[in-house]
Amino acid sequence: MTEFIFLLVVIGLIFVFLSVILSFIPLGLWISALAAGVKIGIFTLVGMRLRRVPPDKIVKPLIKAIKAGQDVEINKLEAHYLAGGNVDKVIDALIAAQRANISLEFERAAAIDLAGRDVLHAVQMSVNPKVIETPVVAAVAKDGIEVKVKARVTVRANIDRLVGGAGEETIIARVGEGIVTTVGSSNSHKEVLENPDSISRTVLNKGLDAGTAFEILSIDIADVDVGRNIGARLQIDQAEADKRIAQAKAEERRAMAVAREQEMKAMVQEMRAKVVEAEAEVPKAMAEALRTGKIGVMDYYNMRNVIADTMMRESFSKLGQERQQEEKE
């Protein structure tokens, strides 16, 4: 009985020991690598565990690469994983590039992956070009008619410029700029409607893919529509603005005229006050002249008669003017 218990304890200890060893050493993965012809040491897998690198994240892509004929070192795969890269996607990209006869080295693919680009998608796009559809671009021809253009841009990924190259947004912006420039240089919107391919030829010859991660293969005009008459609208707005400016200037002149009128009225009142003041000095001057003997009494009365006669004639003239006015009415 004692021997049986001792045997159970020994078996239990052996089971615990093997469980710890197998959990620390991926024995099944090591056997799979050997079966696939990948030479990898058991202690290499243990080292991955110590460096907290999941061995299956490295060994499975390595098996895939070796089977595809890729010469990849396990240390490079582990270093790429520790740098935050996607090892499996890099290996898939290398295999896809090899099948498509595209020159792509592991270092280049790893750099593209670490730069945040989808290296596998880039390789696939190099084989199967992608069509980018631009939004509707509105441009105005020289005759003032708006033309709305929609284009499709066929691009292919440029592996050599994926790191540091501009993306799809830059391509769309440059194509839109080229469309606006081409339509704007057309003498009439009819030229654009008759020859829409002239837009694609002109834009394609501008080398819009410079500095981008893509190579433009073709630019096709998908749709061309006629929009608003921008020229006429601008002329209407300009005429309205000129009208408002003229009204403002007329109002300014009217205000100045009113101010000038008020100034003249004030001057008239001032002159009248001076006349009244001067008339008040006349009796004093007459008295002084009579006192000093410069005029006689008869001269004074003659002057008074002339003044009275003048006043009578003025009154007759006013009465005649009033009667004529009444007869006209």
UniProtKB/Swiss-Prot annotation:
Membrane-topology descriptor: Multi-pass membrane protein
Keywords associated with the record: Cell membrane, Membrane, Transmembrane, Transmembrane helix
Record bears the keyword Cell membrane: yes
Residues in coiled coil: none
Keyword Cell cycle: no
Record localization: Cell membrane; Membrane raft
UniProt GO cellular component terms: membrane raft; plasma membrane
Pfam families (alphabetical): FloA
Function: Found in functional membrane microdomains (FMM) that may be equivalent to eukaryotic membrane rafts. FMMs are highly dynamic and increase in number as cells age. Flotillins are thought to be important factors in membrane fluidity.
Subunit structure: Homooligomerizes.
HAMAP family, sorted: FloA
Protein name: Flotillin-like protein FloA
Source organism per UniProt: Thermoanaerobacter pseudethanolicus (strain ATCC 33223 / 39E) (Clostridium thermohydrosulfuricum)
Gene behind this protein: floA
